[in-house]
Amino acid sequence: MKQGFDHRKYLTIQSEHIKKRIAQFGDKLYLEFGGKLFDDHHASRVLPGFQPDSKLQMLLQLRDEAEIIMVISAYDIEKNKIRGDLGITYDEDVLRLRGEFENIGLYVSGVVITHYNGQSSADAYRNRLERIGIKVYYHYTIDGYPHNVQLIDSDEGFGRNDYIQTTRPLVVVTAPGPGSGKMAVCLSQLYNEHKRGIKAGYAKFETFPVWNLPLKHPINVAYEAATADLNDVNMIDPLHLEAYGEVTVNYNRDIEIFPVLNAIFEGIYGENPYKSPTDMGVNMIGFCMSDEEVCSNAARDEIIRRHYDALNRYALGADNEHEVNKIALIMKQAKLTTDYRRTTVAARERKEQWDCPAAAIELEDGTIIKAGSSELLGPSAALILNATKHLAGIPHEVKLIPQSMIEPIQRTKVSFLHGRNPRLHTDEVLVALSLLSTTDENCRRALDQLPKFDGCQVHSTVMLSEVDRKIFKKLGIGLTCDPIKK
């Protein structure tokens, strides 16, 4: 995969910039960490070269100076809110993340339960955490938050919250998902630190939108497509423009909330150290692109991927018509159609030629490989075989898996497992190749090509099964599907 982002440069300049921000405030910096620390696949897709755990690796540069506070809303505990990408509840994800952080040497000092007003489910969760030695703090709901500044900046507002004991100069505040109350936790701590005579500051780490790229840069447009369900909108930061005469990009929620933050800061310190939402940020990603065109093309692919993802969920019954329409509008404004994705055009051509479900993959060198479904194989399984043969230099007419092996597998699927689709999926094809590779040199060579799929793009003219989707994801393949059920 062509690289467009300098990962090593990012680790260096991002950690150094955070150190400078800590020094700006004196004793302590509360850093609100938006987005995902682990598995940031959106960033890795639009910035080829950015690793899914790049932000985590960056924090490891600061491990001796940093501690982590996990935040979870009592509302999310009560309704068992699910993290969509992992399929686990937020309360379980807090424990998962804590374990992941500590396994790599990062210190987690506690968990804050926000929006607390006596929920029994929150009390039970607190007891569960305390039994395994985790410090837990309650932060209460505040009437009129965030606009009732007089109450917020008082002993009945932030002063009512549990004071979180911290010991290190950098306090990273993170959560399983949005709406958990990370910013309020940071501001509450500023209030309570100030009362104790401790100089503390606040900064915000948001990967997107990238503040020093143009508003309509494909990377920023891709972020808008990714958050279409939240109705986020990228905007020119008018406060930054007024203060410095410099055009920067932020998103609507931060711009809308800034006057309130300004009043809260003034209530705590007497003045606001920041003149704009952009000032609050510490993101240095925009300085680390090594090939902007590679990143721009990847971002365009991501916009189209989001378009198909929304259409697929809508076809499966999701109530997301607004999201579908918004992404369609984003594509129109970006003068982007699905034909930009070469695999889409190729897969549809094969479908028309053979009158069957089809799929196509674009390899790293730009080669397009196509496949259609047959009585033996689904389109994705056939595509894996065709692509590995091409990469291994095996003639197309060579059959890697003999029909005599496929047919017994089909019989088991239908006769004994009561399946309706006898065709082999990608996982079944890969298992068959693995078994044959011990005696068949072609199968061994074909399997050895699998790492070359990382970063490749695939389009299918039908929606694939969950099994096939997971295999493509594990191989690092970017998948899109027409919203048509098999």
Predicted regions span which residues?
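Short HxH-centered metal-ligating active-site micro-motif
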Residues: 390-422
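Residue-level recognition of the N-termini of beta-strands and the immediately preceding loop/turn
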Residues: 108-109, 357-358, 398-402
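Hydrophobic positions on the alpha1 helix immediately C-terminal to the Walker A/P-loop
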Residues: 185
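P-loop (Walker A) phosphate-binding loop of NTP-binding proteins
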Residues: 176-177
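Flexible phosphate-sensing "switch/lid" loops adjacent to ATP/NTP-binding sites
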Residues: 1-173, 189-348, 356, 363-365, ...
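Feature captures eukaryotic membrane-trafficking machinery centered on endolysosomal pathways
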Residues: 349-377
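A short, polar/charged loop-to-alpha-helix boundary motif
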Residues: 376-392
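Conserved glycine(s) of the Walker
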Residues: 180-181
